[in-house]
């Protein structure tokens, strides 16, 4: 499967920064998940604010600022931003939600139109996220993963 990760942090990183102080949980999850999916034989591309276009451990890291390839992926996973799906073509789209996605937040971050355009399933990290986020985020389905403890 050809899988793409999309992230638009305001700092540069790639998988060699896995133990860096600058990484937060979302970036660490992206690195670890991309490595494990690559180990399972999937073709992985990470489009983010990396230092330069390069291949590290069979994973393609591409600078988001200059990415314009419009490659088609089987699956695209965006790290908290639906507008990043505009950069690629994908058969399936998943939005990783690391925080509460309120309707107001979708509007404030100018993601409401891209959410309806791309219709991603949203990955929630806990029942708390599912129960305390806008119901609009479940229009196209959601997935709950057990990365933490609910209680």
Where do the PLM segments sit?
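Conserved nucleotide-sugar phosphate-binding/catalytic loop shared by glycosyltransferases and other
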Residues: 3, 36-43, 54-71
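Short N-terminal targeting/anchoring amphipathic segment
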Residues: 4, 66-83, 94-96
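Short beta-strand scaffold positions
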Residues: 78, 124-125
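A short, gly/pro- and small-residue-rich
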Residues: 87-103
């Amino acid at each position: 499967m050809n899988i793409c990760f999309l992230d638009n942090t305001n700092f540069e990183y790639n998988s060699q920064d896995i133990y860096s102080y600058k990484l937060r949980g979302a970036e660490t999850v992206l690195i670890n998940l991309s490595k494990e999916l690559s180990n399972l034989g999937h073709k992985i591309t990470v489009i983010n604010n990396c230092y330069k276009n390069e291949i590290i451990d069979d994973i393609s890291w591409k600078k988001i600022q200059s990415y314009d390839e419009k490659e088609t992926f089987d699956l695209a996973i965006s790290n908290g931003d639906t507008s990043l799906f505009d950069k690629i073509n994908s058969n399936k789209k998943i939005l990783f939600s690391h925080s509460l996605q309120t309707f107001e937040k979708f509007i404030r971050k100018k993601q409401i139109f891209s959410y309806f355009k791309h219709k991603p399933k949203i990955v929630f990290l806990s029942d708390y996220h599912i129960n305390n986020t806008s119901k609009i985020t479940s229009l196209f389905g959601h997935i709950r993963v057990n990365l933490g403890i609910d209680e």
